[in-house]
Amino acid sequence: TRTIDGVALEFQMVPETEAPAELNVMFPERKTLVIGEIATCSLHNILTPRGAQVRDSLAWAGYLTEAIRIYGDRSETVAASHCWPHFGKAEVRNYLTLQRDNYKYLHDQTIRLMNKGLTQAGIAEELVPPPSLTNEWTNRGYYGTYSHNSKAIYQRYLGWYDANPANLNPHPPAERAKLYVEAMGGAD
């Protein structure tokens, strides 16, 4: 807790979620929690399509649990960077809980399917969130999706290799195309 220019602030560090260094800020006198980007109006990316380190979806869910525990009963407003505010203790708690449940479900079900031997592509096809999560507009995949986020979680734990030896050291696309043409009897 810090007082800056007469305003009391409480900080919750939430590293390795949306960014390597991220934090939430509580304004206790205003009963307002600024949740940063760990709760938004859509499922967030666990790995950005443009590239970055894979984010820790399990820690992400854990920090949302911590925010609910620390601030849930004290917050009457929650504001997020890329979302409209939510008002009322019940709505704040519901919003944060559903966001948390979404990331936890995504993580846990990806791990379950990995343990069943599914590949990244197989998990992306198999994993479908339940209506209890997707009925909430702010949990839907308008930004991040279950498909590419499950692949990111797979990558975080098992890397890029899919256990198919043909994919370990593949030919570049141009060379592979020549080999396909040759295997089909040539260009003529």
Protein language model regions, located:
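Metallo-beta-lactamase
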Residues: 8-116
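Gly/Pro-rich turn-and-neighbor structural signature
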Residues: 1-9
